Structure formats: structure tokens, C-alpha cells
Amino acid sequence: MLKEFQKFIMRGNVLDLAVGVIIGSAFTGLVTSLTKNLINPILSMFAGKADLSGLYFTILGAKFTYGNFINDVLNFLIIAFVVFLLVKGINRILPSKPAKPAGPTQEELLTEIRDLLKQDQQV
């Protein structure tokens, strides 16, 4: 059982996934730092606040920190854009798979069925 587990872990897909998760978490930290330390100060110049994460409004005593949401949206958009660029670049580098040959059309299938039915009637 231990050998099966080792064989499973050493397969390419599992290792690729593990590397992807590790790099992804490191990249998320990098993007968070980019948003917090570079993008937020630029946006705060326009918002008039030193820190966007401190933006909030209160309704009936409930505090809604929409500044944190803005930071999270910026992080998501940056990560999504980078992933888009990576996928686009990889698709350009890797050869595309040839298209599967098209099967017979409906008319060809119906003609074949008709011919088979005629043969059955003649026998």
C-alpha cells in the first residue's frame, strides 16, 4: 500500500499540482504586496485617504469595510490577468492538437440506414 501511495505521489500530475499550489501561494503574497505597497498609495492620492483598507461605512452599528473589498478585488484582477497572460503564452508555445476528423453527416448516416433497410427487405 505504501508503494502504491509513493507511485501515486510521484506521478507527474500530482507533482505538477503541488508545484503549482506552492508557486501560486507565493505569487499571491507578491500580488498582495504590490497592491498594498504600490497600487493603494496611488489610489489613495485620489481617494484622499492614506490607506484604502481603512475605508468603511456604518449602517445601524454594522461596519462595512469596503476598502478591504477594493484591495481584494484588485488582487483578484491582477492574478486573473497574469494567469490569462500565462495561459495565452503557453497556448502560443505549445503545438495545438490537430482537429478530430469530422464524422459522417446526418444525411450520410440516413442514406446508409436507408440502404441497409433496403437490403433487409430484399433478403
UniProtKB/Swiss-Prot annotation:
One of its GO terms (cellular component) is plasma membrane. It comes from the Bacteria. It is a multi-pass membrane protein. The chain crosses the membrane at residues 14-34, 67-87. It is found in: Cell membrane. Gene3D superfamilies: Large-conductance mechanosensitive channel, MscL, domain 1. The keyword Nuclease does not apply. The keyword Kinase does not apply. Channel that opens in response to stretch forces in the membrane lipid bilayer. May participate in the regulation of osmotic pressure changes within the cell. Belongs to the MscL family. This is Large-conductance mechanosensitive channel.
